Amino acid sequence: MAENTDADLAGRRIEIAAALFGAWSGGDLDGPRRYFAEDGVLYDIIGGEHRGWPAIRAYFEHGRQRYPDLVLEPTGDFWSRPDGLAMLWTMSATQAKDDLGPELVGRRWTVEGMSYLIFDGLTVVREADYHDAGSRERSLRGG
């Protein structure tokens, strides 16, 4: 039996993080659930804290309704520590509402962000997402 090293665990967690972000980008609202503890926490710097899978799913559903073609894509930059990892990603979607001006409806925006994931073994118990509230509009306006 092979010994589970810190590097092995970090590698497996990176695979889980990539799969989790793939699930956030998918159409199945319960897709991310398999990576999260039932009592896990999702914190978003803009959207606040959501405790437990039902609250996380409701927040995710709201985001998917607003941006049906949302894509969260890890850049490949990961940093690990014994209880988790941090990662960079891009988020993109098509602007569907005119809250930033009717001239921007139908345009695709792309923003950068960073997350850290805390694990219990290979299960995410906390995800914290950081991104700039003004970056979506800057992307749409070419700034």
Ranges and model annotations:
Residues 29-83:
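A solvent-exposed, acidic/Ser-Thr-rich amphipathic alpha-helical stretch
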Residues 82-95:
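A short hydrophobic beta-strand element
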Residues 86, 110-138:
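Short beta-strand edge/turn micro-motifs at domain boundaries
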Residues 92-120:
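Exposed beta-sheet edge and beta->alpha loop/turn motif
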